[in-house]
Amino acid sequence: MLSPERLALPDYEYLAQRHVLTYMEDAVCQLLENREDISQYGIARFFTEYFNSVCQGTHILFREFSFVQATPHNRVSFLRAFWRCFRTVGKNGDLLTMKEYHCLLQLLCPDFPLELTQKAARIVLMDDAMDCLMSFSDFLFAFQIQFYYSEFLDSVAAIYEDLLSGKNPNTVIVPTSSSGQHRQRPALGEAGMLEGVEASLFYQCLENLCDRHKYSCPPPALVKEALSNVQRLTFYGFLMALSKHHGINQALGALPDKGDLMHDPAMDEELERLLAQVPGLVNSITASPEASCLPSRTPPRVGSPWRPLHHSRKVDGESDGSTEETDESET
């Protein structure tokens, strides 16, 4: 049944909004790359399986980063897959370094860029503590903001630097690789950086940016709410406020609330059902429950979407637990 939103938009606008052309092009490319295998099952079945995988969010597993970040749906799917695969890290209370979290990301996307992981870690950690340990929940919610709103945050970093230096904030921002978000955090002696910028003026600039930005932006009303209790703020203070804001997490729709981060009963039940079908596997999983949530360190490249998709997405095995705050102690 067609949704009211679908009926309210012209066909071409709806197709563009849902990035249907992106998925059609990818499906055709995979069809051509694997035509010999697909000929055994039929083209109709291939397209059915492909678009089922897109709806289920499993189509991004083990794909190249350019595809993983290509659409908002792909980004949400990747965030959800990362959470489901590695919830056991939070359940067990394990604290990992930035490099270790990056290794986990690369299990799902082999060419995932280190720079994005570093940016997410900077939201959580102090300026001189990039090698310190982080809890799963702290990293995950910071990573969600950094990954999903990446282009928007690059523009925000440029706006912040302009405000800090007294430039006109109404000029068009063209973010570059040298934008403020890529730089080291300021030293403690840099009073101007520590003081930050006026929150109300900063929000006005962000509101104008959201109006003209072609990439995904957090809802302006929620951004205003996140900044409502401060008079001045730093750039990383702003990112931290976004990552901790309940409403922004709900609006993005990729992750559950922090209190429910370790709960996914449907996935756990399905995993148990699948494991029961594999002779000799249940005992080993029972002896080492954390092993079931980690995909292979060298996952195969997905050549055809209909082959591994219905199994790759159900790879998690824990149910309940709690997270720890970021700590510098050794695990």
From Swiss-Prot:
Q: Where is this region: Required for interaction with TPGS1, LRRC49, and TTLL1?
A: 1-225
List the biased-composition ranges (Acidic residues): 318-331
PTM annotation (Phosphoserine): residues:
S319
- Entry's Gene Ontology cellular component terms: centriolar satellite; cytoplasm; microtubule
- Location of the protein in the cell: Cytoplasm, Cytoskeleton, Microtubule organizing center, Centrosome, Centriolar satellite; Cytoplasm, Cytoskeleton
Q: Which domain of life is it from?
A: Eukaryota
Q: Provide the residue span(s) of the region labelled Disordered.
A: 289-331
Region of interest: Required for interaction with PCM1: 1-111
Residue ranges of the region described as Required for interaction with TPGS2: 112-331
Q: Which UniProt keywords apply?
A: Cytoplasm, Cytoskeleton, Microtubule, Phosphoprotein
Q: Does the keyword Phosphoprotein apply?
A: yes
Briefly state the protein's biological role: Regulator of the tubulin polyglutamylase complex (TPGC) that controls cytoskeletal organization, nuclear shape, and cilium disassembly by balancing microtubule and actin assembly. Regulates the assembly and stability of the TPGC and thereby modulates polyglutamylation of the microtubule, which antagonizes MAP4 binding.
Subunit-level organization = Interacts with PCM1. Interacts with TTLL1, TPGS1, TPGS2 and LRRC49; the interactions link CSTPP1 to the complex TPGC. Binds to alpha-tubulin.
Family designation: Belongs to the CSTPP1 family.
Query: What is the designated name of this protein?
Result: Centriolar satellite-associated tubulin polyglutamylase complex regulator 1
